[in-house]
Amino acid sequence: MSDAGLSQENNAAVTIACMPVPWEEASRFGVVITDDTGKVTDFEEKPANPRSNLASMGIYIFTWKVLREALIKMRSVPGCDFGKHILPECLENGERLFAYEYNGYWKDVGTLGSYWQANMELIDIIPEFTFMKNFGRFTLTVLYFRLSTLQRML
């Protein structure tokens, strides 16, 4: 099921695309704490002592109403950030946040070292991800239509 389908099935206000990372790297990410159903019970942005290794990929599906309200409320916050401000605000307001555990290709490029490593992997003799092989899948344009359903995405 796509994360768009999961959002609808769970009546989620926000769906967070996540991926397990090694525990020793979890403090570099926003981490998601969930219950048994995948409902987000807490979100910690780059915690010193993470309670989870389920890392946010920085990819979110919001209902327009919830996103708009959070952005309006946070507009005066300098350096407003989804992980530090928007997601915690949604949780505090009692919104339904769910995690979608992605199991495809994804690389963090948040540090110079990880950016370099991702580039080196792409030029490997047999890269883990081949853009030309996946061209149609990874070049879809995402559009917004009122009361629409997202049918395909990464």
Please give the residue ranges for each predicted region.
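Short, surface-exposed amphipathic charged segments that create phosphate/polyanion-binding patches used
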Residues: 29-33, 58, 113-117
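Left-handed beta-helix
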Residues: 39, 64-154
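A generic structural signal for well-ordered coil/turn residues at beta-strand boundaries
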Residues: 28, 55-56, 103, 150
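Conserved beta-loop-beta/alpha segment of the NTase-like Rossmann-fold superfamily
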Residues: 1-36, 61, 69-73
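Flexible loop/turn segments at secondary-structure boundaries
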Residues: 23-25, 50, 106-108
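A short, charged helix-loop
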Residues: 35-55
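Short coil/turn connectors at secondary-structure junctions
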Residues: 9-14, 56, 94-95
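A conserved catalytic-core signature of glycosyltransferases
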Residues: 56-57, 62
